[in-house]
Structures are given as structure tokens and as C-alpha cells.
Amino acid sequence: MRAWRGETRWWWLAKRRAGFALGLAATLATGAAVVPVATAEGTGGGSRRGVAQEGTAPLEQVRVATRHYRNVDSAIDAGYVQFLGCVHEPLAGSMGIHFVNGTLAGDTTIDPVKPEALIYEVEPNGQLSLVGVEYIVFQQAWDAVHDQPPSLFDQPFMLVPSPNRYGIPAFYELHAWAWKVNPTGPFKDWNPKVLCLGTEGHRP
């Protein structure tokens, strides 16, 4: 696994983030083909003690689909790029560090096995640990072809208006904490168990 800390790593990530931003802007400017939203019923049972809530089949579906990305190098190779730093909200918790796939984020498809963002937490040893995913679709593109806001796993997406802390157009989003328990709920935005400690330089 690539070392996370170090000047060379930061320079490399800065270049990747710049490329991601340009690619996402181009996608939004040109538009993308519209694909109907996927259904999102759970496909299998079970969960892992200490990993996610027991008996939550959708989370198991997410784990199966994202197991390969527990190694962040695999996520990077698949087109996921770090977007901003460790997102933290006092008293509420954190969202961790998001790696976003610009191609997936720029379309209007919501696929439970192809999340637009992967969420990582920095461990004490400096390595990144996968803790969850986020599904993202831009409001303008979605509303142009749908009468209702998106939903997945019987959960409604939250609308994040613009302007926002991320500096991007208004979007709908849903978190799924498949790899780390969220005591406030598996689909809540903020996870008090996720920390931004020791991640100076990551916070937006």
C-alpha cells in the first residue's frame, strides 16, 4: 500500500484533485446520458460484528461491492480521487475523507454497487481505512428527468444546496456506513465514531 504521509504523496494527490475538478466541470458542462435509477433492495443477509449494524442487508450489499476498495490504492486505480479533506462538524461527528469518482458523480445513475464516493478514516499509523460510501447526484441533472428526489435502500437522499462547503453545485446525497458502525444510524450523514484527529492538512 502506498504510504499516506509525505510531501511527495501530497503533491501527487494535489495533481489528481486538480484533474478531477477539471473533469467534473467538463462533465457538468456537456451533460451526461440519463440512466434510470437502479432498484436497491438488499440481496443477502448478515453483517460483521463491530463493522456495521446486524441484520442490515443493504449494508452487506455495499460491503460486497466495495471490499476491493479497502485498499485505497485499488480505489485510486479505479478512478477515485481525494476530494477535500476530513470533513468534520463539531458535536455531530465526522464524514471522513472522501475519494470521489468523477465519472460516476457526473451522471444521473444511482447504483447501490457503484457508489460515487468512498469514505476513509486515517488510522494512527497513517494508513487509510474504508468506513463507508456516499451516493451523489447533482440536483439539476436529477430534477430535469425526475419528479421526486432520489432514494436508495428505502432512504431518502438529503439535498445539499449551493453555495456549500464543498464549492460544487447543489446535489443530493446519501451516506451508508457499511464498514464502521454509526451509533446514530447506518445512513446518517455524521458518524461520531469517525475521527479527524491527526489529519492536519485534510480539513476543508
Give the positions of each predicted feature.
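N-terminal secretory signal peptides that target proteins for export/translocation
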Residues: 1-15
